[in-house]
Amino acid sequence: MNAIIIIPARLGSTRLPEKMLADIEGEPLIVRTWRQAMQCCRASRVVVATDSVKIAEVLTTYGAEVVMTSPEARCGSERIAEAARQFACDVVVNLQGDEPLISHETIDLALEPFFSPNPPDCSTLVFPLQPDDWAQLHDPNQVKVVLNREGYALYFSRSPIPFQRNQLTSTQCYRHVGLYAFKAEVLQCFAALPPTMLEEAESLEQLRLLEHGYRIRCMVTHDDQPGVNTAEDLELVRTLFKQRHQEA
């Protein structure tokens, strides 16, 4: 099985402009994420897909492989689908460029189901939440997911799901970790599909897959590392990197 990692990276960001080039202990954010991906054991190649010449020029100075993509892509998965057409592979990992602390073990975990006799259409990661974790459950920036008994996603939402009607019982809640691995052919089919009603209502591209009948296997991870979406996130990640360097 040949798996590749593609990291979509765009320069524009509403909440944190040019965050991909933000400095983290001497290296740009996107370079930090690329370095983590390069340590992955189950992928044979790591590529960054971008529509920004500025990002491409920075990455090439570090030796990263870069593919230029169209600025018309509607989401990260469409951008990696465009890039993936240039490579012969069985599985494509969509790793967000703003995840500089993600471990290679976590990426490998997302690829694990594709080594089974019955691989899924797509896999992703989820982190277990406590039912009383009110802040994360009610934060629309934290996407929640409910699973069936086999570990496949039933639904993703920015609202707290499942609703805890009976406070005397507790149901396991999960937060979605935005990393995906696709069968190569499923990725291309997904990118060709028009956006769906639920996808647009929640602003969650993975709902396009569920609405069209694809199955998403959710692997539970306990490695909870922050991504970079806001200026506050960036400062937290900088602090964590500094602590790691001091401990090394």
From Swiss-Prot:
One of its GO terms (cellular component) is cytosol. It is an enzyme of class 2 (transferase). It is found in: Cytoplasm. It catalyses: 3-deoxy-alpha-D-manno-oct-2-ulosonate + CTP = CMP-3-deoxy-beta-D-manno-octulosonate + diphosphate. GO terms for biological process: CMP-keto-3-deoxy-D-manno-octulosonic acid biosynthetic process; lipopolysaccharide biosynthetic process. Activates KDO (a required 8-carbon sugar) for incorporation into bacterial lipopolysaccharide in Gram-negative bacteria. This is 3-deoxy-manno-octulosonate cytidylyltransferase. It comes from Chlorobium chlorochromatii (strain CaD3). The gene is kdsB.
